[in-house]
Amino acid sequence: MSPRGTGCSAGLLMTVGWLLLAGLQSARGTNVTAAVQDAGLAHEGEGEEETENNDSETAENYAPPETEDVSNRNVVKEVEFGMCTVTCGIGVREVILTNGCPGGESKCVVRVEECRGPTDCGWGKPISESLESVRLACIHTSPLNRFKYMWKLLRQDQQSIILVNDSAILEVRKESHPLAFECDTLDNNEIVATIKFTVYTSSELQMRRSSLPATDAALIFVLTIGVIICVFIIFLLIFIIINWAAVKAFWGAKASTPEVQSEQSSVRYKDSTSLDQLPTEMPGEDDALSEWNE
């Protein structure tokens, strides 16, 4: 082999060696870069997972209020309740809307609902009464069959007697002595209203009716006198307002007359006082004048 061929083969080997080294370095750099990229992606994934977890925890901790609560608060602010129609037992009341009424109205009635007061309604009056019978009514609202009714005959110092009648209206025949009844209104076996009645005898009822006309006559007389006095005072005030100048002049003249009289009396008093204070004549001067005359 010639020296020239040997030099060419050596140069070729060196070139191939450098190419192999360059390939190994490039491959190693690619692996390192991939590893770094994979590590970065892993860290990014972990960061995203942590961010998502933190966001979920924040969302759980700071959850917005439920729409039902908000709607309920809005309803409370926009709705008012009217007065109950009764002071005891069962009645109705109006539900009034204060915002969002049709036609731009400030208030409008949305519905009518049931309302309840204290159960004890005391002593009531019958719906009708005659000399033979009387009709009593329990506390109720429409419809009548919604509630249950329990009538009792009250006895002094004894247990009450529960009657068979379970309707809202009870008709009682008058007897020789007064009677007392009680009606309990029940809703789902719960007493919601109680009222009592006194059933008088026919003679007591006649006496009560005979005493009423005298009371009514006295009341009418008092009311009539009161109305007449009020009308007279009103007309008097109107007359004074219309003729205020004449009234003022009249009262001015009335007021000036006592002043003139008081001034005259004071002048008279001063005159009488001055006359009383004049000096009397001296007795010596009278004697001198008499001697001179002689």
Swiss-Prot record:
Residues 243-294 are cytoplasmic. The modification Phosphotyrosine is found at residue 269. GO terms for cellular component: acrosomal membrane; inner acrosomal membrane. Residues 42-70, 258-294 are annotated as: Disordered. Testis specific. Glycans are attached at residue 31. Residues 1-29 form the signal peptide. It is found in: Cytoplasmic vesicle, Secretory vesicle, Acrosome inner membrane. Its main location: membrane. It is a single-pass type I membrane protein. GO terms for biological process: acrosome assembly. Plays a role in acrosome formation and establishment of normal sperm morphology during spermatogenesis. Important for male fertility. This is Sperm acrosome membrane-associated protein 1. It comes from Homo sapiens. The gene is SPACA1.
